[in-house]
């Protein structure tokens, strides 16, 4: 069987995203909470994420930029303070994950807007989403 070859340089941006998103299926989707300097909680879904190792434990996610090239809130908050909580979600959380994917202005909290229940994390500032079955506190 011949391998399918894909030249990423010839298919940038949205074309590459569509192909890459379809290569690894099914793939987990994380809902990531971060917090900005003013204490506003951001929540955003990520399909480009996974755990990559155990020594040390390593989780990786790939936030994209806004259309104007500026970092989205998750990336900006991670660059500013280096902390997040990566939540693994189950099917009952699907509607909330879609709602959190909407583009909101910086400083507007998806957690507040969607009335997501939280409780404090033990090791990082961003909170844990109560309804998610798994929460990884990350630095």
Q: What does each model-identified segment do?
A:
Residues 1-42, 50-139:
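Active-site-proximal mixed secondary-structure blocks
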